């Protein structure tokens, strides 16, 4: 069974949590796209929900699928956000942002009563860090921000290289918010909460891809079926 089928099965399991009248956060990335497509099928059959997209890509996908959309300017809270992850550990802490939407993803997740993460089983790791950690930054003063980031890595017991994410045109990748992304290739993050705290206070850092204590449920699809992990 290929990974796309596993992602779709995880998305289908998360869809079972959706009820009519819910307000949903719609994640970004290949796994979240499967959820949006399956949700669209339910909407066409009469399910009434409203969604808040976490990126312009997801907005376009949701509109194509006939999903009614709104924004966090119009509603206060969401019932559930369903999103993917680049890595998830056994504490249900995550690395997200491989698709470049980490800022909006975190805003939407924080405004939700529950966050359900959907993924194939390869995303479950003992320690975060194998997947490069995305850090969204302001272009101004990039050199100073880089130096501050390296100091934060050292303080958190990490070591690694920072690379500016390229876009398709060969220039720097630009997020929906107009920022750049530095990908930190750390290999291993021994204390994700500590690193998250250190990154959050650096001037020039808009947001980082460590989602600590945010996921309520993780749905993992593997060759042996679906595994659901709930936050203790």
UniProtKB/Swiss-Prot annotation:
**Superkingdom, according to UniProt?**
Bacteria
Q: Provide the active-site residues from the annotation.
A: 105 (proton acceptor)
Catalyzes what? aldehydo-D-ribose 5-phosphate = D-ribulose 5-phosphate
Swiss-Prot/TrEMBL keywords: Isomerase
The biological pathway it contributes to is: Carbohydrate degradation; pentose phosphate pathway; D-ribose 5-phosphate from D-ribulose 5-phosphate (non-oxidative stage): step 1/1
Q: What's the EC number here?
A: 5.3.1.6
- Report the sequence similarity comment from the record: Belongs to the ribose 5-phosphate isomerase family.
Free-text function comment from the UniProt entry: Catalyzes the reversible conversion of ribose-5-phosphate to ribulose 5-phosphate.
How does this polypeptide assemble, per the annotation?
Homodimer.
Protein name listed in UniProt: Ribose-5-phosphate isomerase A
Query: Origin organism of this chain?
Result: Rhodopseudomonas palustris (strain TIE-1)
């Amino acid at each position: 069974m290929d990974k796309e089928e596993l992602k779709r099965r995880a998305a289908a399991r998360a869809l079972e949590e959706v009820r009519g009248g819910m307000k949903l956060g719609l994640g970004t990335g290949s796994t979240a796209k499967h959820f949006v497509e399956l949700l669209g099928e339910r909407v066409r059959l009469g399910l009434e929900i409203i969604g808040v997209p976490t990126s312009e890509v997801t907005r376009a996908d949701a509109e194509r699928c006939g999903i009614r959309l709104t924004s966090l300017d119009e509603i206060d809270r969401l019932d559930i956000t369903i999103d993917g992850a680049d890595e998830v550990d056994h504490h249900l802490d995550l690395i997200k942002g491989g698709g470049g939407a980490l800022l909006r993803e975190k805003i939407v997740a924080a405004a939700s009563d529950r966050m359900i993460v959907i993924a194939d089983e390869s995303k479950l790791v003992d320690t975060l860090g194998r997947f490069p950690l995305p850090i969204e930054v302001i272009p101004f003063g990039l050199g100073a921000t880089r130096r501050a980031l390296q100091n934060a890595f050292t303080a958190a017991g990490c070591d690694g290289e920072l690379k500016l994410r390229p876009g398709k045109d060969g220039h720097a990748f630009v997020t929906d918010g107009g920022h750049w992304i530095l990908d930190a290739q750390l290999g291993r993050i021994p204390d994700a909460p500590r690193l998250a705290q250190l990154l959050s206070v650096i001037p020039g850092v808009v947001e980082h891809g460590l989602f600590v204590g945010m996921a309520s449920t993780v749905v993992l699809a593997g060759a042996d079926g679906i595994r659901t992990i709930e936050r203790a």
